[in-house]
Amino acid sequence: ADLWAISSEDHYLRVHTDRGEELILMRLADAMRELGEDNGLQTHRSWWVSHNGVADTRRTNGKLVLILKSGQEAPVSRTYQPNVRAAGLA
């Protein structure tokens, strides 16, 4: 399956892929460490997005949002906006 994004929910991670979503018990920091920096980047304190998972970008009320290939919206916080822009995702 192609990994598009990971979002944290309490002590779990929701893994977004081309085959749907699944909840796993893991910390976001541990998942990002295993994935490495070449595959994607953190866009928010609770979101990691794969470079190949982004279909589009949009601004909603002045806030940057990445639209995943699934249609799901991944928020981009001000803290991570420079990294998202540098990666060419916005």
PLM regions and their residue ranges:
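Basic, polyanion-interacting recognition surfaces, primarily
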Residues: 1-90
